[in-house]
Amino acid sequence: MCPAGWKLLAMLALVLVVMVWYSISREDSFYFPIPEKKEPCLQGEAESKASKLFGNYSRDQPIFLRLEDYFWVKTPSAYELPYGTKGSEDLLLRVLAITSSSIRKNIQSLRCRRCVVVGNGHRLRNSSLGDAINKYDVVIRLNNAPVAGYEGDVGSKTTMRLFYPESAHFDPKVENNPDTLLVLVAFKAMDFHWIETILSDKKRVRKGFWKQPPLIWDVNPKQIRILNPFFMEIAADKLLSLPMQQPRKIKQKPTTGLLAITLALHLCDLVHIAGFGYPDAYNKKQTIHYYEQITLKSMAGSGHNVSQEALAIKRMLEMGAVKNLTSF
């Protein structure tokens, strides 16, 4: 080979070394690019990793609240919402009577479930992950994050969408699939009251929310599920070390994203995440979502400790309980 050729090879090798060093040295190096072929799914793998995170861990807890647990036998709860149902049982009973608690049969029957939790982070923008996301058995989305117009980056498949009344400002038919499960995360008794008025077309409630939820919401009641507060409890207790009893004015709680990861570790055998993470605190101008121009300032007063949650997610990544499809 001529000297010029050797110089070119040396230059390429140097560039490769620099790129590898930069990737390793970055704080957000918990990044696992999507393989072209499906990663093998090992039955029980997520459950095994989750037991190290959550301690005395069991999959006996139902994912969604069930009518039979409140109608025939009164299921006692030690905590009020969002960590339990204490004091809200009568209202909850009316909601469970008009909704369902089943998981889709095609998901329930899978021997090994491959899941991805799609966050709302800005780093999904121009990620071109859409096709890869659509290949998972279960795709979990959060709140009002849109799909229409962003399919190339976030995909179009939605198995479940976690939401609460104030985040329900999306068109259930446009931003979801006909068989998507819309999973209500109840933070307070008024959340049950809201979904009851929507589904039963009763007089709407306008007070008791930090942001006015939709008054008209065109949704099929068969798609609605009520998330078991057990997942909020273990996310708060085991991942964030938050006390279950907090003063009303200082209440901290997990984000919907961390809650969704906790749920996925319970439901799935393989768990990947995408679009998680916030800008550094000093970066005041960076938008936090892939679909809207809001910054970290909007999180003030939300009751979420994003720094603490970042540490919890990094711990899960280090343990291999979850893998990341975008930088973190």
Swiss-Prot record:
The gene is ST3GAL4. A beta-galactoside alpha2-3 sialyltransferase involved in terminal sialylation of glycoproteins and glycolipids. Catalyzes the transfer of sialic acid (N-acetyl-neuraminic acid; Neu5Ac) from the nucleotide sugar donor CMP-Neu5Ac onto acceptor Galbeta-(1->3)-GalNAc- and Galbeta-(1->4)-GlcNAc-terminated glycoconjugates through an alpha2-3 linkage. Plays a major role in hemostasis. Responsible for sialylation of plasma VWF/von Willebrand factor, preventing its recognition by asialoglycoprotein receptors (ASGPR) and subsequent clearance. Regulates ASGPR-mediated clearance of platelets. This is CMP-N-acetylneuraminate-beta-galactosamide-alpha-2,3-sialyltransferase 4. Residues 1-7 are cytoplasmic. It comes from Pan troglodytes (Chimpanzee). The lineage of its organism: Eukaryota, Metazoa, Chordata, Craniata, Vertebrata. It catalyses: a beta-D-galactosyl-(1->3)-N-acetyl-beta-D-galactosaminyl derivative + CMP-N-acetyl-beta-neuraminate = an N-acetyl-alpha-neuraminyl-(2->3)-beta-D-galactosyl-(1->3)-N-acetyl-beta-D-galactosaminyl derivative + CMP + H(+); a beta-D-galactosyl-(1->3)-N-acetyl-alpha-D-galactosaminyl derivative + CMP-N-acetyl-beta-neuraminate = an N-acetyl-alpha-neuraminyl-(2->3)-beta-D-galactosyl-(1->3)-N-acetyl-alpha-D-galactosaminyl derivative + CMP + H(+); a beta-D-galactosyl-(1->4)-N-acetyl-beta-D-glucosaminyl derivative + CMP-N-acetyl-beta-neuraminate = an N-acetyl-alpha-neuraminyl-(2->3)-beta-D-galactosyl-(1->4)-N-acetyl-beta-D-glucosaminyl derivative + CMP + H(+); a ganglioside GM1 (d18:1(4E)) + CMP-N-acetyl-beta-neuraminate = a ganglioside GD1a (d18:1(4E)) + CMP + H(+). It comes from the Eukaryota. It is a single-pass type II membrane protein. Residues 26-328 are lumenal.
